[in-house]
Amino acid sequence: FFFFKAHKARVGARTSFLTEMERGSRDHHRDHRDHREHRETREPPTLAFHMKSWKTINKSLKAFAKLLKENATVTFTPQPSIIIQSAKNHLVQKLTIQAECLFLSDTDRFLTKTINNHIPLFESFMNIISNPEVTKMYIQHDSDLYTRVLVTASDTCTQASVPCVHGQEVVRDTGRSPLRIDLDHSTVSDVLKWLSPVTKTKRSGKSDALMAHIIVQVNPPTIKFVTEMNELEFSNSNKVIFYDVKNMRFNLSAKNLQQALSMCAVIKTSCSLRTVAAKDCKLILTSKSTLLTVEAFLTQEQLKEESRFERMGKQDDGKGDRSHKNEDGSALASKQEMQYEITNYMVPAKNGTAGSSLFNEKEDSESDDSMHFDYSSNPNPKRQRCVV
């Protein structure tokens, strides 16, 4: 009797244990299913602007929209940041919108994505973020093949799925430089005014590639901007500060130098002039504010014939560092500078006019004049020396 009673108790305990296991397994599968359904229904990771911060940089973004047109791409990163990059021959321009201006809902699931600046319906991404009528804008990552852009403006709410661009390189500064010179905003404006008549001459067809040359000398620390028309010289002062100096010369397109300085002048802070030893980048101009960072990477142009700058450079070599002549003189002129290749993903406008846009806001001017600083003084003096 006692044997059968004990056996019955053991069977009951085993049955109870199996029931608990089955119940636990069912609960686990149910929880897993609920988690999967929640994951499938929750919102994709979303990048958005802090609208209060965005309003403070809206005018700057409007100016950048005019300067960043050629071969422009937009990269969204999980830092978060938005990088707008534009490329032309011997010049790469880069605008970074910092994390202080952005909000990201899920940093773990948001992957770096790159799209073309041209967006159907909106005309361009820069047009969206520089339009004062925008009240909300979201960038959502729910596919590796495209990026979803949602825009709200007054009584309009629109979204577009933009194909991603793969294999696109973001130009980055190595941070190591044998040269660093800081120019304050007023000095940058002075150089732009000085360059203005030189770049305007190009429209008359007198020259295919008008050059601007930069000469840096160690003793005493000076930086010269030289063209065929005249030259501008700055020495060490509270407006031009020499941190690291090396005898160097740069042969640049005057138009490229003007556009790079114009980018730096927009945010009205000091401009840092640096260089790197890599073949594909010789000169870097950088300006930073709390919310924006501007970088311009310029590579040297090849000189077709000996210019006044080259003749003057030969005279300066007797006073300066002769080893630098072998480094940056004829050796560079005989080599083809490597170039950052950023493919043109821009969609050409029909009949030479801008395509239709959701906002369709008429710009003040679409000509190059809208990017130039006014220049009214007489450039007759062949040499100008600026010392503060």
UniProtKB/Swiss-Prot annotation:
User: Basic residues bias located where?
Assistant: 26-36
Q: Which family does the record assign?
A: Belongs to the herpesviridae polymerase accessory protein family.
The protein's name in its UniProt record: DNA polymerase processivity factor
**Which residues form each disulfide bond in the chain?**
none
UniProt region (Disordered), positions on chain = 20-44, 306-388
Keyword Membrane in the entry? The reply is: no
- What does the record list as GO biological process? DNA replication; viral genome replication
Reply yes or no: does the keyword Phosphoprotein apply.
yes
Q: What does this protein do?
A: Accessory subunit of the DNA polymerase that acts to increase the processivity of polymerization.
Transmembrane stretches in the record are none
Compositionally biased residues, Basic and acidic residues:
306-328
Annotated source species: Human herpesvirus 6A (strain GS) (HHV-6 variant A)
Drop me one GO molecular function for this one. Answer: DNA polymerase processivity factor activity
What UniProt keywords apply to this chain's record, in alphabetical order?
Answer: DNA replication, DNA-binding, Phosphoprotein
